[in-house]
């Protein structure tokens, strides 16, 4: 009877890996899988399993072997066939092939089965080895056996040579042999190791005591020194053996017990026991201490080292265990669907696979990969199911397989066709096979006579000969439908198993779920090494069956219809029984997660993994004759397994498609951005030409209509320039080419510039623009001020656009302090911000009508920098709040969308809708955020944050600046009096702003709220009460403030003047009744008083002895102010203006460092500031002393007349309206005023771009109203006291020359002041500030950045008007609307622009008529008007300037005609070509000698006389002007010396003017200068730019040369400094400006020339562009659009050479 052996072919061996884990399998599932796949036709087999390896295959090897150790009787009964009793013996230790033939049912490759002597005698070797443990324990147990064996031989050796110690050695030999035997038989490894350590220690210590005792006995009776020395040497040798044995015991502890705690315990115990033994030897055996010390120190040292090593090793083990634990979790927690498979047969999957394919793991048993990935079926296909079997000898076959063991083959069919071609190699066995189609068919089995009645398989594939690749449509997956992934030969080569072994294969295919849904999947196929390092560290549940001699496997099962197999696998005490009954004689062919490990000594193990169709009857005869039997042996117990990761990339594919579409859209968008960028740059060129041309035309002689249209052109061009700039910025940001600058700037100056750009538009709408800055905010910052200002201006422009009444407030606060080293102060800063924000609104607690501020306001400054040495970063918040229409909540989310506008129509509010979008992007670039809060119908609050830096760890905050100002006042005036008083304005927010600024200098004033008539008081009180109840709620405060402000605005004309007078009087009385009233100074700041209140307080203050300084709040809407007011506090309120006011009160001069900090001025500016301030004060003091008596008399005479009128005194004179034509001039002016809104749709637009071109300018109103007192006396009782004190004294910064300034003639003084850009205000104080304007005279080109300059409007007409109610209104026609016309004219005044005096920013003043011969003509003379006092006066002053054309669109400036109080005549000198006459107003004729008004008949007679006098004066002026023109022409043609026209040359040459001003003596006289006409070279490829710039230069008496490109420029420059200045365009097609400049600098070096002044021309005015210009050798750059004021600044700085 043949012996049947079943063996499995395995995958080739591979080295193990311990870094990857595999999924878990329970033993129950494994048993079920095994039993479900074992065919009922297999009779009587044994399974012997191994513990360390797993073998998973799909083949059956039936081997006939003889085994003497295991006898298994397998019985099988069958009704249809003869019973065959087969004795199948499987030898675990030495499998042997006895049968000459073997039957191989194999779809995998074959391996050679090697046999060796060691393997045949494995059973004998196992006797001397320990039982199977886990690998680490097994190795330690082998070491223990080795030590026992070694000690047996050592003790035997010592027994021979050291016979005196034979009892110890005999005990050692016996104990070691016993321990060795016990170790091989028991699994109690730790107990045996512990006994071994204990026995070794006892033997070793006994040996030490014995040698010590012998040494003492032998040395007692020895007297010879040599003998004693020999004994000592002998003892030392034996003691050395003791120490070595002890050290070996300590090392063994560390080896046998790897756990740190247990090993340390044993080590310490052994050392303690050693110490005890040596103590006994010292006291009992008299052992020498040196030997004891040696025996103690050596083991302790070794123990310490070993303990340290054990500790490090334990840490490493913990890390390894943690790493393995993480690896075990990777499988289940992976985001990829992981599949463990063998040749496409699914072994295990993770939870992600279940989610992707929507199937449970339990349903995946017996599944294949291609059921879910159909296109991978061809990957695992090989042949058509015809396995070749050869009849050659076994040895030859094995040799061939051994030669090709390392070569992998794969035969993949054409997956695109239904017909499959199979190829096999004669000398190779394919690695991967198709289990669907390549199964063993019945024909082959019948021919082999292996099985009878073999049936086709039904579970996998009934079509044995048809091999289909399930081609799934890829239309919904993003893959191509044209071909499969395995269609061509290249794919076959690429997807071969050879490539899989080298590197993983990644491919995209189509996945299908059981529901039929398709998706695109990315599959990664790779081969992993077996990572089984033991059952405790692997995620597999292995069936570790320890096979001993006593193991028996009995498989008995009887069934009438089936052959049943019962496999009883015994592993010590574990028995696994599985039964399988199948009535259909069919079994599942796929085994999932079956791992049966066999062969303890790395021998072959058999695994039953796949059984094909089988018959119920076996023919052993055909089996022996037709089959071949190959016993496949594995070299190693560890093998490879295949891993497949699947990722659902449907979304990725769709995203890729969308990404491609997005890329195409981005390309189109980029093309549009490039187009916009190019067009924007190109459009700016003609716009710059338009604006410059308009500025040139504005200086010519135009009538009112022409000037009106010219203003429309200018406003339209400004609007278009802003649109183009927004589009350009937007396109740069979108293209990612936008860069921010980092420069140092002054926050206060930047905010003032921003507010003044928009203030004129706000003033026209009646809106207050206020500033609130928290005290802890730094004022010197590093960042991009241009972009911060742009964001603020965008917010301000929108706020003003959507606000019709109320106010717009700019608030700055600290959000957070970003410190590089410490961030501990962030909370403090935030708390300060909250407190300071509350401080802005707590003035609205209006329980009483008069609200005061206490001294405990929360103005804490807690910016504590704890030793930070780096730059501090602050996150500042800029907020713009308005009381406008508000925004609906549903619209807020769309506000920052590009091109979005409220209401969806740009016609109502204009604009492109890019402002907020650009602001948002700029804020993001600056590291901040943008936000908005709005209540519809109440107002909005837009805010943004920006990260700005400071250059110091102790930044200068606003609070520290105020403290410095307060300290400066104390130093300059040690006996400084206490200031008290109050503030009043019709808008409570204006008072709050003033209060906050004054509080910085420790000046606390009370605030008086607006007092409305009785019908509105209730409403205001309710609002005030609401403010009291909601001080801590910012939103409520804002709303209530807005309501309160709206009430004030609605009732501007309903202010209760009587009640207001009563409140003022009470406050003044309260301050005057103070006991120490001598040192008490009363400071009062109010808006303009009514006529009755003004007269009342004049009389009241004259009766008081206190020092009362009454300042008026003025926004230059006033035509003139009464001398009752001590000074003016300008609107919009700013810190510099208030500082000037406070220093005037104390009669002190501002220190230089504080002046520069407030104004950004230079040292020269400060010197001029002190010089002209002292000169004017000194001269005016003398004039006031001379005229004091006359003015008092005139005031007394005119008092009755002025008090009888209801209008204020400053409206006594009618407005001036003189046009170039005599007929219909008044109608033209009136029509222009009436149609102002309709004349230009952009009249309310804020010209942001032009306002921002001139950076670092402070657009403050320059000329305040004059001291206009018709009574002729000074009503200010304190003016004499102020003027009598020399303000130079006590100032440490004054030059010595300034203290000895002699009195100047008033005409010379004013001429010098005008030439320096300084202006004398009504309080004898010089205002010397910068402001933004395109013309120094405030023409229609003045941008929306300043305020109107005050003037006395005078309307002169030739005919009488009987219906005129005003004394000075004379019209040609009878018109009842004169008052309305006058009012319109009064409300439309422009700025008289003056610039700060510095070399870089100098602008010529208006013409000053010094005497009858010397006239200094203005540069920009259009329709000049000369207003002069009588020539008999010692202080005659004639001012030539432009006419106020009264058109609100043109915004022409008004002039301040000084009044000669003595002669009471006002002479107006016109220089019009058509009407060249002087208009003289004689106030004695109008008011009479006593100051009273005369009847109308007398007035008409006086007017006729005046007209005659005017005609005579006009004729004289015409002659003078003709002479002047002839002289000027001769001077230009002959280039004569300056002579009598010295001042004219100064004005026409800013460079000479700067030099002359610096060389002025104390009297303001300048030394004679020999002038020459300056020459400029313009290098620009655009004709328009050359033309415009040349015209501007010619107006300033410059000669101009041209060059179209750099090559022509190089030809023009032939000698050293042949041009005073060169304007170089940067972008030119032929040799641009940068290269031309470099070539010029090289030429200068070669020829040793002095360098030329080269200024770049470009629309880019950023600091980064400026750095590029400087790097190439340019001196500076001039930004476009070029205005007259920027051109003058450039010429002043680079328009000549000093050396």
Curated annotation (Swiss-Prot):
A matching Pfam family: PAS_8
Modified residues (Phosphohistidine): 681
Gene3D superfamilies named in the record: 1.10.287.130, 3.40.50.2300, Histidine kinase-like ATPase, C-terminal domain (3.30.565.10), PAS domain (3.30.450.20)
Keyword Acyltransferase (UniProt): no
Residues where 4-aspartylphosphate is found: 1625
Keywords of the record: ATP-binding, Kinase, Membrane, Nucleotide-binding, Phosphoprotein, Transducer, Transferase, Transmembrane, Transmembrane helix, Two-component regulatory system
Every Response regulatory domain range: 1575-1695
Disulfide bonds: none
Residue ranges annotated for the Histidine kinase domain, each copy included: 678-950
A Gene Ontology biological process term: cheating during chimeric sorocarp development
Subcellular location per the Swiss-Prot or TrEMBL entry: Membrane
InterPro entries, sorted: CheY-like_superfamily, HATPase_C_sf, His_kinase_dom, HisK_dim/P_dom, HisK_dim/P_sf, PAS, PAS-like_dom_sf, Sig_transdc_His_kin-like_C
Membrane topology annotation: Multi-pass membrane protein
Biased composition, class Low complexity, residue ranges: 7-32, 544-593, 1219-1239, 1283-1294, 1355-1392
Function: May act in a signal transduction pathway. This protein undergoes an ATP-dependent autophosphorylation at a conserved histidine residue in the kinase core, and a phosphoryl group is then transferred to a conserved aspartate residue in the receiver domain.
Stated name of the protein: Hybrid signal transduction histidine kinase E
Species per Swiss-Prot/TrEMBL record: Dictyostelium discoideum (Social amoeba)
Gene transcribed to yield this protein: dhkE
């Amino acid at each position: 009877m043949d012996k049947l052996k079943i063996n499995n072919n395995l995958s080739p061996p591979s080295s193990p890996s311990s870094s990857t884990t595999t999924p878990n399998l329970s033993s129950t599932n494994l048993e079920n899988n095994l039993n479900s796949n074992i065919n009922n036709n297999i009779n009587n087999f044994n399974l012997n399993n191994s513990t360390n390896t797993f073998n998973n295959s799909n083949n059956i090897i039936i081997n006939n072997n003889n085994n003497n150790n295991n006898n298994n009787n397998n019985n099988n009964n069958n009704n249809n066939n003869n019973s065959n009793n087969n004795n199948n013996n499987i030898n675990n230790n030495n499998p042997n092939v006895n049968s000459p033939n073997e039957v191989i049912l194999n779809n995998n490759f074959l391996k050679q089965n090697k046999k060796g002597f060691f393997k045949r005698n494995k059973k004998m070797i196992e006797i001397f080895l320990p039982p199977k443990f886990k690998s680490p324990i097994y190795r330690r147990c082998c070491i223990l056996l080795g030590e026992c064996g070694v000690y047996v031989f050592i003790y035997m050796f010592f027994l021979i040579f050291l016979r005196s110690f034979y009892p110890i050695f005999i005990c050692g030999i016996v104990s070691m042999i016993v321990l060795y035997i016990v170790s091989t038989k028991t699994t109690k490894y730790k107990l045996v190791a512990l006994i071994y350590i204990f026995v070794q220690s006892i033997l070793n210590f006994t040996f030490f005591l014995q040698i010590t005792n012998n040494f003492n006995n032998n040395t007692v009776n020895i007297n010879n020194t040599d003998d004693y020395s020999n004994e000592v040497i002998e003892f030392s040798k034996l003691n050395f053996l003791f120490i070595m044995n002890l050290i070996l015991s300590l090392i063994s502890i560390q080896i046998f017990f790897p756990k740190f705690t247990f090993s340390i315990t044993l080590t310490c115990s052994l050392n303690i026991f050693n110490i005890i033994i040596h103590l006994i030897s010292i006291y009992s055996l008299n052992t020498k201490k040196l030997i004891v010390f040696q025996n103690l120190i050596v083991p302790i040292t070794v123990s310490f080292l070993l303990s340290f090593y054990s500790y490090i090793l334990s840490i490493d083990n913990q890390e390894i265990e943690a790493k393995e634990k993480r690896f075990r979790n990777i499988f289940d927690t992976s985001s990829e669907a992981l599949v463990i498979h063998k040749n496409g047969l699914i072994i295990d999957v993770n939870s992600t696979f279940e989610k992707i394919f929507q199937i449970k793991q339990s349903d995946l048993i017996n599944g294949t990969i291609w059921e879910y990935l159909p296109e991978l079926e061809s990957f695992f296909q090989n042949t058509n199911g015809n396995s070749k079997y050869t009849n050659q000898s076994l040895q030859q076959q094995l040799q061939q397989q051994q030669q090709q063991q390392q070569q992998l083959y794969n035969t993949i069919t054409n997956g695109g066709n239904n017909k499959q071609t199979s190829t096999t190699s004669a000398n190779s066995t394919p690695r991967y096979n198709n289990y669907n189609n390549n199964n063993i068919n019945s024909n082959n089995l019948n021919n082999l006579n292996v099985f009878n009645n073999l049936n086709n398989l039904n579970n996998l594939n009934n079509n044995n000969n048809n091999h289909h690749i399930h081609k799934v449509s890829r239309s919904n997956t993003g893959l191509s439908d044209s071909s499969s992934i395995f269609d061509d030969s290249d794919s076959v080569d690429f997807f071969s198993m050879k490539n899989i072994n080298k590197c993983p294969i990644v491919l995209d295919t189509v996945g299908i779920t059981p529901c039929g849904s398709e998706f695109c999947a990315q599959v990664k196929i790779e081969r992993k090494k077996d990572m089984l390092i033991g059952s405790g560290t692997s995620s597999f549940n292995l069936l570790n069956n320890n096979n001993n001699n006593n193991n028996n496997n009995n498989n008995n099962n009887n069934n009438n219809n089936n052959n049943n197999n019962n496999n009883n696998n015994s592993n010590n005490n574990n028995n696994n029984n599985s039964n399988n009954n199948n009535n259909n004689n069919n079994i599942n062919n796929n085994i999932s997660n079956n791992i049966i490990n066999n062969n303890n000594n790395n021998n072959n193990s058999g695994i039953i993994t796949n059984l094909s169709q089988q018959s119920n009857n076996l023919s052993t005869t055909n089996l022996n004759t037709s089959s071949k039997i190959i016993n496949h042996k594995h070299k190693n117990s560890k093998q490879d397994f295949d891993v497949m990761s699947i990722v659902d990339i449907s979304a990725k594919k769709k995203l890729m498609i969308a990404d491609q579409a997005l890329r195409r859209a981005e390309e189109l968008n980029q093309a549009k951005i490039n187009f916009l960028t190019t067009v924007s740059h190109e459009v700016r060129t003609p716009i710059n030409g338009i604006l410059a041309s308009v500025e040139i035309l504005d200086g010519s002689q135009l009538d009112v209509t022409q000037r009106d249209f010219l203003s429309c052109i200018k406003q339209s061009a400004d609007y278009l320039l802003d649109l183009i700039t927004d589009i350009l910025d937007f396109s740069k940001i979108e293209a990612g080419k936008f860069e921010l600058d980092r420069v140092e700037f002054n926050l206060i100056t930047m905010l003032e510039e921003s507010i003044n750009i928009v203030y004129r538009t706000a003033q026209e709408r009646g809106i207050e623009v206020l500033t609130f800055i928290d005290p802890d905010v730094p004022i010197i910052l590093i960042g991009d001020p241009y972009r911060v200002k742009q964001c603020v201006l965008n917010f301000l422009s929108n706020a003003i656009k959507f606000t019709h009444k109320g106010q717009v407030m700019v608030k700055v606060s600290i959000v957070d302090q970003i410190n590089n080293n410490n961030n501990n102060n962030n909370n403090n800063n935030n708390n300060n911000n909250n407190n300071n924000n509350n401080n802005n609104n707590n003035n609205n607690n209006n329980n009483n009508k008069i609200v005061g501020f206490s001294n405990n306001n929360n103005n804490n400054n807690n910016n504590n920098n704890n030793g930070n040495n780096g730059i501090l970063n602050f996150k500042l918040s800029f907020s713009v709040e308005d009381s406008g229409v508000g925004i609906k909540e549903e619209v807020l989310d769309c506000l920052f969308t590009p091109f979005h506008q409220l209401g969806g129509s740009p016609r109502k509010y204009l604009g492109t809708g890019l402002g907020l979008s650009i602001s948002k992007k700029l804020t993001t670039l600056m590291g901040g955020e943008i936000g908005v809060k709005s209540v519809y119908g109440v107002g909005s609050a837009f805010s943004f944050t920006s990260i700005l830096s400071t250059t110091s760890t102790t930044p200068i905050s606003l609070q520290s600046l105020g403290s410095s100002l307060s300290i400066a006042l104390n130093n300059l005036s040690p006996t400084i009096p206490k200031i008290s008083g109050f503030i009043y304005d019709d808008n409570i927010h204006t008072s709050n702003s003033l209060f906050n600024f004054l509080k910085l200098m420790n000046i606390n004033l009370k605030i008086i709220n607006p007092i409305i008539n009785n019908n509105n008081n209730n409403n205001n009180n309710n609002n005030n009460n609401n403010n009291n109840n909601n001080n801590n709620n910012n939103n409520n405060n804002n709303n209530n403030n807005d309501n309160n402000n709206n009430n004030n605005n609605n009732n501007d004309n309903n202010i209760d003047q009587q009640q207001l007078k009563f409140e003022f009087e009470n406050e003044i009385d309260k301050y005057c009744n103070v006991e120490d009233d001598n040192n008490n100074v009363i400071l009062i700041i109010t808006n303009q008083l009514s006529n009755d209140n003004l007269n009342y307080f004049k009389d009241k203050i004259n009766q008081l002895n206190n020092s009362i300084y009454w300042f008026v709040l003025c926004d230059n809407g006033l035509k003139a102010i009464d001398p009752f007011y001590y000074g003016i506090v300008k609107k919009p309120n700013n810190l510099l203006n208030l500082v000037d006011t406070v220093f005037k009160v104390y009669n002190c001069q501002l220190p230089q460092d504080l002046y520069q900090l407030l104004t950004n001025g230079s040292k020269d500016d400060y010197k001029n500031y002190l010089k002209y301030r002292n000169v004017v004060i000194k001269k005016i003091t003398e004039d006031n002393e001379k005229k004091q008596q006359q003015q008092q008399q005139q005031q007394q005479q005119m008092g009755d007349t002025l008090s009888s009128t209801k209008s204020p005194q400053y409206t006594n004179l009618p407005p001036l309206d003189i046009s170039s034509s005599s007929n219909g001039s008044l109608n033209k002016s009136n029509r222009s005023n009436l149609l102002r809104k309709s004349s230009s749709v952009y009249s309310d637009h804020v010209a942001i771009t032009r306002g921002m071109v001139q950076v670092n300018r402070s657009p403050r109103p320059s000329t305040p109203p004059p001291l206009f007192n018709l009574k002729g006396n000074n009503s200010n009782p304190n003016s004499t006291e102020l003027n009598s004190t020399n303000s130079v004294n006590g100032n440490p910064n004054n030059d010595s020359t300034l203290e000895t300034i002699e009195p100047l003639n008033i005409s010379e003084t004013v001429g010098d002041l005008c030439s320096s850009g300084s202006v004398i205000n009504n309080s004898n104080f010089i205002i010397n500030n910068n402001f933004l304007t395109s013309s120094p005279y405030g023409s229609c080109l003045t941008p929306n950045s300043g305020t109107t300059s005050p003037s006395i409007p005078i309307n002169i007409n030739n005919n009488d008007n009987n219906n005129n109610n005003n004394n000075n209104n004379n019209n040609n026609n009878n018109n009842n609307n004169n008052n309305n016309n006058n009012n319109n004219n009064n409300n439309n005044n422009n700025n008289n622009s003056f610039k700060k005096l510095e070399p870089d920013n100098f602008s010529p003043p208006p013409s000053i008529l010094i005497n009858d011969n010397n006239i200094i003509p203005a540069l920009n003379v259009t329709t000049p008007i000369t207003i002069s006092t009588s020539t008999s006066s010692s202080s005659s002053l004639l001012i030539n300037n432009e006419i106020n054309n009264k058109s609100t669109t043109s915004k022409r400036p008004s002039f301040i005609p000084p009044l000669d109080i003595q002669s009471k005549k006002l002479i107006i000198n016109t220089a019009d070509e058509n009407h060249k006459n002087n208009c003289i107003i004689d106030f004695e004729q109008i008011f009479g000698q006593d100051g009273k008004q005369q009847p109308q008949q007398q007035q008409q007679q006086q007017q006729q006389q005046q007209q005659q006098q005017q005609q005579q004066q006009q004729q004289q002026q015409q002659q003078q002007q003709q002479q002047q023109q002839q002289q000027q022409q001769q001077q230009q043609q002959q280039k004569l010396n300056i002579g009598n026209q010295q001042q004219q040359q100064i004005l026409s040459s800013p460079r000479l003017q700067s030099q002359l001003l610096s060389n002025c003596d104390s009297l303001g006289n300048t030394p004679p200068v020999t002038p020459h006409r300056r020459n400029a070279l313009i290098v620009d490829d655009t004709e328009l730019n050359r033309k415009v710039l040349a015209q501007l230069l010619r107006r300033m008496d410059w000669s101009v040369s041209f060059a179209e490109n750099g090559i022509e420029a190089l030809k023009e420059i032939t000698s050293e400094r042949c041009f005073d200045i060169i304007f170089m365009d940067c972008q030119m097609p032929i040799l641009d400006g940068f290269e031309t400049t470099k070539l010029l600098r090289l030429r200068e070096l070669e020829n040793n020339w002095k360098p030329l002044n080269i200024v770049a021309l470009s629309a880019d005015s950023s600091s980064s562009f400026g750095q590029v210009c400087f790097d190439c050798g340019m001196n500076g750059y001039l930004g476009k659009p070029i205005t007259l004021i920027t051109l003058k600044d450039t010429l002043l700085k680079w328009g000549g050479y000093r050396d």
